[in-house]
Amino acid sequence: MDKVRIHEIASELGLKSKDVLQKAQEMGLKVKSPSSGVSFEEAEKLTDYIINGPAEAVAAKPQEKPKKSAPKKEEKPKEEVKKEAEEKVAASKKEEEKPQEKKSVEESLTPPSLKKRRGLVIVKKKRPKVEPKVEEKEAKQETPQVTAEEETPLTLKRKPKKAKKSTPPAKKNEGKKIEILEDRDLSDVSMELEEEVVVLPDFSEELQKVEEEQKPKEPQKKNKQVKVARKSFAIEQQGISRSKKKKRKKKESKSETEIKVVELPEEVRVYEFAEKIGKSVGEVIKVLFNLGMMATKNDFLDKETLEILAEEFDVEIKIKNVLEELDYVKVYDAVEDDYLEERPPVITIMGHVDHGKTSLLDYIRNSKIAEREAGGITQHIGAYMIEKDGKRITFIDTPGHEAFTEMRARGAQATDIAIIVVAADDGVKPQTVEAVNHAKTADVPMIVAINKIDKPEANPDLVKSQLAEIGITPTEWGGEYEFVEVSAKTGQGVDDLLDTILLQAEIMELKANPKREAKAVVIESSLEKGRGPVATVIVKNGTLRVGDHVVCGVAFGRVRAIIDDLGKMIKERKPSEPGVVVGLDKVPPAGEILVAVKDAEEARMYAERRAEYERQKELSKTTKVSLEELSQLVKEGQLKKLPVIIKADTQGSLEAIKGSLEKLKNEEVKVDIIHAGVGAISESDVTLADASENAVILGFNVRPTGAVKEKAKQLGVNIKTYSIIYDLIDDVKALLSGMLSPIIKEEVIGQAEVRETFNVPKIGTVAGCLVTDGVIERNAKARVIRDGVVIYDSKISSLKRFKEDVREVTKGYECGLMIENFNDIKVGDVIEAYKEVEEAATL
């Protein structure tokens, strides 16, 4: 080991980890937690600092605990005794003991110094106190277990005192010291259990007697005596220190767990954590409670809470990725490519909606993609290849609509160079900034194409200045980004753009190995009639061939067909080439990595085990809600949901729609997506919608068949289909708005000032008023205002003019009125009449 952890030093010294950590920080060592490590040299300095300073006062009491330690530390001491015996028989003990001391310091950083201190104190203070019978056996036990480390410190300190006595006593002293040192573990807890220790005084007297008896005996015999003595010692001490032994056991187990590194999955419950660290669930819950967290044994613990608990229980945790052993991509990448050749660059075209991305690509490859997209807006990602001067370039076209954020992010991750298209007549827009951020996040080089340069209102300088504000400065202004002015309509500047792309690709030295199995990234996926699940991929490395066994996340299969960007069936795709793969068992999520493996069994193993993990993870998610949330949900009519079933033609569109609809919510209403899938609207979707109250089926680029329509009509299920995402989102907004409670606004209709009051027996107080503003209406709501303060809010129960009932009195006229349930009207009060107007709420 290169380093020693703070908690290890603490366990050796018998102190708490936090105390040692504090001392280390006082010394200026860079440590943050008990798990932090320090070098051996720093550990020695830290030990000396603790012992020679504040530890001196504590030294006397820790010594008292040796009694307990004797029974527990049998194994290690025996080995040490053998070493000592050999050393003693060999030659001069004093000279050999000193070098041993140095070695011991290296091996167990702090014990030697501690032991020295304890030895001294015990010899001085403990001799006068005697408890003869019990202590004899104790002495026997501890004497034989002398370690080289322990003897040395004692001899050094006791030389002067023992010189006065006979030579043999010197060895006895060593024996005594060893006893004390041997019980080091007990004294580890010195600070907490000082009051409990009462047996130590017996040791010193009895030790001397035992040592004198054992003096002539061979070291090997001592070993035997150790075993016997320990047994008797344990038996005799049972009545006296049983509780202490229990505590000691706990401490020993604690020191073991301190060294433990516990591996935990990302998702772990309280009881699972307790099992892993060897504690009871109650202990863990108690600690959580003390930290202010209420938890049951089935609750999940987040990473932050796990770190806090690890600190509390002095364990080191390591979060392991359960999928690591199922990471087929990692296995693929582990094989180094021994052969590399140049590959075409993969270019992603990104930018704001309607800025001409697809039109630009359309001009480059001379097709009419934009006309086929609903509303001329790109709804799907397309991947295409073109040739320029004998060199090929792969293009990915991403949608610019705000709902397709994730699709743009995937495009950025799968690409080598990003083309940011900005309209010269429109400037930088929100999705332009977002596209720039995606490219920066993916660490992809950017080229800016200023489109629509042919328009009279085009202002390329404005675009440059706007982009410079967000850190995209053109090279002509001293920046590092290439700006190319183009027109997708006339073709102006398109060749310059392609040349710039090829130049950038040449600088990047893009290479791959076409002579190995394929690795590809899924750009788009869908469920097609007659073909089943299909995935549009771009090969990143290797060659993808028809017949290959592939795994793609939780999907697997055999490549039955590959279709290129022109719709032709082909046999293989090489690095940077796009293709549509047919043959997977399910629709893979966009952005997933597809890898060719050696056989169907391996592909199935990866996919099925990953699918099982995902299923377990989904099932294990807690559904617990807080009391506050629960009380809010229980309030009548508080939260209204619009249950919807979404079906789309592609995975990317489905994700975009789900993301947009989940944002349509407030504290009163929200969209509840009860099912979402790729493919046509089926009868099972209609059945599910019927089972869910007021559910609506939303289809995007898919339509129901005749049988499905008929069933929906019979069950009264509403099916809405769309081809443009704007329309779908707007319709859902309208549906949600209809569920919102109307907004009630007050409208003041008039004011009247009380000029006189009349008390009418059995009726109440009538206020004679002059209307000063607006109109006073009978049965209108009214509030009585006195000195600017509202003192009553009710309604006008009676309104008369010249003793006749009237419906309303306008400004400038006098009237008599009564306020319902209020007779304390006084001259000078103001009556304010108002009505409540309901307005439809909108999201």
From Swiss-Prot:
Region spans: G2: 376-380
Protein keywords: Cytoplasm, GTP-binding, Initiation factor, Nucleotide-binding, Protein biosynthesis
Chain intervals for the UniProt region annotation (G3): 397-400
Region (Disordered): 55-185, 209-228
Binding positions for GTP per the UniProt entry: 351-358, 397-401, 451-454
Gene3D superfamilies attached to this UniProt entry: 1.10.10.2480, P-loop containing nucleotide triphosphate hydrolases, Translation factors, Translation initiation factor IF- 2, domain 3
Compartment(s) where it occurs, according to its Swiss-Prot or TrEMBL record: Cytoplasm
GO cellular component, one term: cytosol
Residue stretches making up the tr-type G domain: 342-511
Record GO terms (molecular function): GTP binding; GTPase activity; translation initiation factor activity
Annotated region described as G4, given as residue ranges: 451-454
Top-rank lineage group of the source organism: Bacteria
CDD domains: IF2_eIF5B, IF2_mtIF2_II, mtIF2_IVc
Biased composition (Basic and acidic residues): 62-106, 129-141, 171-185, 209-221
PANTHER family, per the entry: TR-TYPE G DOMAIN-CONTAINING PROTEIN, TRANSLATION INITIATION FACTOR IF-2-RELATED
Recorded family membership: Belongs to the TRAFAC class translation factor GTPase superfamily. Classic translation factor GTPase family. IF-2 subfamily.
Protein name according to UniProt: Translation initiation factor IF-2
